[in-house]
Amino acid sequence: MTSLQLSIVHRLPQNYRWSAGFAGSKVEPIPQNGPCGDNSLVALKLLSPDGDNAWSVMYKLSQALSDIEVPCSVLECEGEPCLFVNRQDEFAATCRLKNFGVAIAEPFSNYNPF
């Protein structure tokens, strides 16, 4: 197993779903008051590196997840490459990425800062 040093990802706060007729190739955000069913997706966005190099890093991360049979897709979201995984696979995906040497940025709040 290789590692990707200095790669940091964070989970985008919104949930997504496949666009009708575009499963695997196009996503749309789920409204905040909408139901998050079993088919909802989470997006992991790369914080570093950025630019053209980000796409190759995201494809390597996608391959790392494919190696453990976690389905995922690398698609553009908010102008950046994002890795989309099924919501029920989020913990397996982040565990695999951590084992692969990727740092996962976690949100902080005033109520639970650490």
UniProtKB/Swiss-Prot annotation:
Q: Show the NCBIfam families listed in the entry.
A: PRK11835.1
- Gene from which this protein is expressed: yejG
Give the residues annotated as coiled coil: none
Q: Which Pfam families match?
A: YejG (PF13989)
Q: Which region is the signal sequence? A: none
Q: Which InterPro entries match?
A: Uncharacterised_YejG
Q: What's this protein's name? A: Uncharacterized protein YejG
